[in-house]
Design a protein with these regions (language model features):
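Short flexible linkers and secondary-structure junctions
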Residues: 1-117, 125, 135, 153, ...
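Sec/SRP-type N-terminal targeting helices
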Residues: 16-20, 33-34, 76-104, 129, ...
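Hydrophobic, lipid-facing positions within transmembrane beta-strands of outer-membrane proteins
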Residues: 66-72, 214, 272-278
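Periplasmic alpha-helical coiled-coil/stalk elements that build and connect Gram-negative outer-membrane
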Residues: 103-217, 323, 327-330, 347, ...
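A short glycine-centered flexible hinge/capping loop motif at secondary-structure junctions
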Residues: 146-150, 187, 352-356, 393-397
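Acidic, low-complexity, intrinsically disordered peripheral segments
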Residues: 377-463
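Short, low-complexity N-terminal intrinsically disordered segments enriched in polar/charged residues
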Residues: 459-490, 494-498
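Surface-exposed, charged secondary-structure patches
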Residues: 516-542
């Protein structure tokens, strides 16, 4: 996985395009800094001038001329326009830098997704192959029985239909594997490795259990938020630079020239000049005021984009982190599901072989097992992908994999970088708290639905015989026993202990140690399941 991701971030066009944009932004800063230095120009000319002046004798005159001139100019004051432009382009460069980091992390995530999807569909193809083999085995058995005259034709047709479906499923999974391999080639730049490898177990490293802590990490580190903040600062510098249009520009100029008949003056050999030039625009139709209003609106737009980026990151990391918890719980349930269905399928096959189960029962069990294994394989891959999504959302995927892709000469750019007062204003750090459903409570509700059936009078064959009715004492004991179990599954320690007498003492421990052990067991994570079957009660006396 790490090798595939490293290859992707080194060669993917999305990353290299951002890198070239960063380099261009760095050169643009140097372009603006050139305004701090003087401009030096060299000019040379050769030609012939003709003129006619009636007060001169002769009135018409022609001169051959040539000359060489050197001039230099230096901006002395421009209302801080150059300084603000350099500042704006510096922030624009940082924007490109953070966009480069974001593209690197996003490409690392996409490469991880492509790698995991290839592994996913290789597993699904293998499961589809096994499913086809099982259906082919059942079909061949029925064909043999049918040809021997001991099987039914309708069973053979059913088996043939299910075999065709298994073949279709295999074809679909192979097509899916082809498609994700093509996506892998696009992102990584090479074909997937021929053999499957274990997924890097480090994907879960450093992920905090609390959703709010993970959100805090993401909002503090994600480069898309940092890029939006620098974009806002660039807009602010641009607006400050617009104020320079209300001030004059002062420029120093020096010029010297040599030549023959230089500058149209006969016999002139040399010409030198030095001057200070002030230029102050007094009116330009209100364009400067309109430009100030325009830049103010652009600042507001950049602030909106910053808050939008923050909210996007907050949503992304919250969903990815919640998917981790969801998929961890799902895998436990799906594992139990696969084991139970596998046992049922094996039992159905044995019963089918001795004629106690129909073919439809067996084929349904095979399909259910295939579906269960497919769901488990998908959940396994989705969990690894959820780890990767969470790492990428808090900008730690490449570092978790031990990889990096730095642009040369950029380390000092963000050495002391901080969001400071430019952090997002409309993006509070909030975690969504959805109350988890207690399986113990749901189980208790299910048992309450069964109470009337358990306490109802049994139906007897002879109407003349009185139906036995459970005594109130027996019904009360049964209900109290269920309440005791419900309190334990709901982790209500005080309610659970209330069912015991104050002088109750366990046979192998003290009462205090027993209570402490009960509380320790209840405090463990996970659900408690307790099933009471075949409750036997007997009333003594009236």
């Amino acid at each position: 996985l790490a090798a595939a991701v490293q290859q992707a971030i080194n060669n993917n066009p999305d990353v290299t395009a951002r890198l070239n944009a960063l380099r261009a932004a760095a050169n643009e800063v140097d372009v603006a800094r050139g305004q701090y230095l003087p401009s030096v120009d060299l000019s040379a000319s050769v030609g012939r001038d003709s003129d006619r002046i009636t007060s001169r004798s002769p009135a018409s005159q022609s001169l051959s001329r040539n000359g060489l001139a050197l001039s230099a100019s230096q901006i002395l004051w421009d209302g801080m326009a150059t300084s603000k432009e350099v500042s704006r382009l510096g922030h624009a460069r940082l924007t490109r830098y953070f966009e480069f980091l974001g593209a690197t992390e996003e490409t690392a995530l996409e490469a991880t997704r492509a790698y995991l999807d290839v592994e996913r569909y290789r597993k699904l193809v293998s499961l589809a192959e096994d499913n086809y083999v099982q259906h082919k085995y059942a079909f061949d058995q029925l064909q043999t029985k049918f040809k021997a005259g001991v099987g039914r034709g309708v069973d053979a047709e059913q088996a043939n239909a299910r075999l065709a479906l298994a073949e279709s499923n295999l074809t679909t999974e192979q097509a899916n594997l082809h498609d994700v391999s093509a996506r892998y080639l696009r992102i990584v730049g090479d074909l997937p490795p021929a053999s499957s490898a274990a997924v890097n177990p480090q994907l879960s490293k450093g992920i905090l259990p609390a959703n709010i802590d993970t959100i805090n990490q993401a909002l503090a580190q994600h480069p898309s938020i940092s890029a939006a903040i620098e974009n806002l600062r660039a807009a602010q510098a641009q607006a400050q630079g617009a104020e320079s249009r209300y001030q004059p520009t002062v420029e120093a100029r020096v010029r010297t020239g040599v030549g023959k008949n230089f500058d149209g003056v006969q016999d002139q050999k040399r010409d030198s000049s030095a001057e200070i030039l002030l230029n102050w625009n007094l009116f330009n139709g209100g364009s400067d005021k309109a430009r100030v209003r325009q830049y103010a609106d652009l600042i507001n737009q950049a602030a909106d984009q910053r808050d939008r980026a923050c909210r996007d990151v907050r949503q992304t990391v919250a969903i990815a982190h919640n998917d981790i918890r969801k998929l961890q719980d799902q895998l436990v349930a799906l594992d139990r599901n696969v084991l139970a269905i596998e046992k049922a399928r094996d039992a159905y096959r044995q019963q089918f072989d001795i004629g106690q189960r129909s073919l439809l029962d067996l084929l349904n069990a095979e399909n259910e097992l295939y579906t269960a294994k497919r769901s488990y394989a998908n959940a396994e891959t989705d969990l690894q992908l959820a780890y990767a999504r969470t790492q990428a959302a808090k900008y730690s995927l490449t570092s978790t994999l031990g990889l990096s892709r730095e642009a040369e000469g950029t380390q000092e750019l963000v050495q002391d970088w901080q969001a400071a007062d430019d952090a997002a204003q409309r993006c509070p750090v909030t975690a969504i708290d959805v109350k988890a459903t207690s399986l113990g409570e749901l189980d208790a509700r299910a048992r309450k639905l069964a109470v009337p059936a358990l306490t109802a009078a049994p139906v007897v064959a002879a109407p003349s015989a009185p139906a036995p009715v459970a005594s109130p004492a027996v019904a009360t004991v049964q209900q109290r026993l269920r309440d005791w179990a419900d309190a334990w599954m709901a982790k209500d320690v005080d309610g659970y202990l209330s069912f015991y007498a104050k002088d109750f003492a366990p046979s192998r421990s003290t009462s205090a140690k027993w209570i402490a052990e009960r509380r320790r067991l209840v405090s463990k994570t996970g659900t408690i399941e307790l099933t009471l079957d075949d409750i036997q009660t007997q009333a003594h006396g009236d």
